[in-house]
C-alpha cells in the first residue's frame, strides 16, 4: 500500500524565526494579513509579538479574535464575513489548534465559496482550490496543526465535533519560534494526553 506524505512549503525553527513572517509576506507580495488569535493570547501580549513584527515592517493587518478553545461553526462564519470585509489576502494563525483550525476553515471557504457551510467539508473535503495562504505561528507544542491537512470544528447545535481533511488547507509557512510558546494550563492537559497515549 502506498503512503502519502504532504509537507508545507517552508518551516522556520529557532529563536528569532518570527522575524521571517515579514520576509515571507514581502516575498509573496502579500498586502494585508488577517490575524487569527484567541482573546487570551491577545490579553497576555503573545499576539502583539507578531503584530510588532508587522508594524516594524510597515505591513498592514487586521486582528480577528472570535475564536474559542474548540472553534464553532459560528466562529468560522463570523471569520469568513470579517475576512471579506477586511480586504486581506492572507492569514496569520497565532496560537494552538483552535486558531489554526479556524484559520484553515476560513481560508478554505473564502477560496471555495461553494462550501459556505463548513459542515459540507466534513470528512475528506472535495474542494478544488488551495485555501487563502496561511502563515502559522504555533504557541503550543503537540497539535502540529501548523503542518497538517485537517481541522476540527464544533457543531454546538448538534453537540458534536467533526473533522475536515483537506490537502488544500495546509499552511504555506510554519514559524516555530521557542519564544512564542506559552505554558497555559488549559492546553497542557491535552499535551500530557498526547505523551501518555
Predicted regions: what they are:
Residues 16, 20, 28, 45, ...:
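Conserved active-site and cofactor/substrate-binding residues in soluble primary-metabolism enzymes
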Residues 1-64:
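An N-terminal, well-structured beta->alpha segment
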Residues 34-35, 90-92, 135:
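Conserved beta-strand elements of the Class I
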Residues 12-13, 64-67, 164, 176:
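Hydrophobic residues at beta-strand termini and immediately following loops
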Residues 30-32, 88, 171:
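Local beta-strand N-terminus motif with an aromatic residue
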Residues 42-115:
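N-terminal small/polar loop signature for handling phosphorylated ligands or for N-terminal nucleophile
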Residues 112-184, 190-193:
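A glycine/threonine-rich phosphate-anchoring loop and its flanking beta-alpha core
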Amino acid at each position: 500500500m502506498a503512503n502519502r506524505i504532504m509537507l508545507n512549503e517552508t518551516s522556520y525553527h529557532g529563536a528569532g524565526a518570527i522575524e521571517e513572517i515579514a520576509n515571507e509576506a514581502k516575498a509573496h507580495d502579500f498586502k494585508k494579513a488577517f490575524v487569527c488569535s484567541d482573546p487570551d493570547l491577545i490579553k497576555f501580549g503573545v499576539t502583539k509579538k507578531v503584530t510588532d513584527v508587522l508594524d516594524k515592517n510597515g505591513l498592514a493587518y487586521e486582528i480577528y479574535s472570535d475564536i474559542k478553545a474548540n472553534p464553532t461553526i459560528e466562529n468560522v462564519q463570523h471569520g469568513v464575513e470579517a475576512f471579506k470585509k477586511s480586504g486581506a489576502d492572507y492569514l496569520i494563525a497565532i496560537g494552538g489548534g483552535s486558531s489554526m483550525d479556524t484559520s484553515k476553515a476560513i481560508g478554505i471557504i473564502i477560496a471555495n465559496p461553494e462550501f459556505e457551510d463548513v459542515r459540507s467539508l466534513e470528512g475528506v473535503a472535495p474542494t478544488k482550490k488551495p485555501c487563502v495562504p496561511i502563515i502559522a505561528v504555533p504557541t503550543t507544542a503537540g497539535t502540529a496543526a501548523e503542518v497538517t491537512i485537517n481541522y476540527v470544528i464544533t457543531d454546538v447545535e448538534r453537540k458534536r465535533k467533526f473533522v475536515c481533511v483537506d490537502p488544500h488547507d495546509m499552511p504555506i509557512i510554519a514559524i516555530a519560534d521557542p519564544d512564542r510558546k506559552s505554558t497555559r494550563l488549559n492546553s497542557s492537559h491535552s499535551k500530557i494526553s498526547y505523551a501518555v497515549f
